[in-house]
Amino acid sequence: MYGRFTEKAEKAMKFSQEIAAELGHSYVGTEHLLYGLLKEGSGIAARVLQGQGMTDDKILKQIEELIGRGEKMKEQPLGLTPRTKRVLELSFREARKIGHNYIGTEHLLLGILKEGESVAVRIMMDLGIDPQKLFHEMVKMLNEEAPSAGGSPKTS
């Protein structure tokens, strides 16, 4: 599945792994993925989240409050939580529904929103974001912008 990721989506995944290791977490959870999407900075997901008033510092603070810190890890965690794996599956499905043959940051965010019960969704709600409303707004936006040929895996 990673082979279909855009450069920005791969970068967001890398940031997710880095923040998990920095926080001393031995896994990559949806909360780390949310942080990575925002930290990436220029993808559709980052722009949407920034438009909702989110910052990487706000997400980091929420992660620390909800989960805490462990010992900083020298190696990046390899394991994705089952919920994060589910989010990736949902991201792929949402991309296909829209007619995209790649996974961009926008699809990763849609996967988080679609899954609906993760730590990432709790963080969004704690920061005043309505995940269901955001999901529907994003789907509408992406359907309006969906290229007929399925898009390019280098853009988002």
Q: Residues of each region from the PLM?
A:
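Histone-fold recognition with a strong bias for associated Lys/Arg-rich disordered tails
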Residues: 1-156
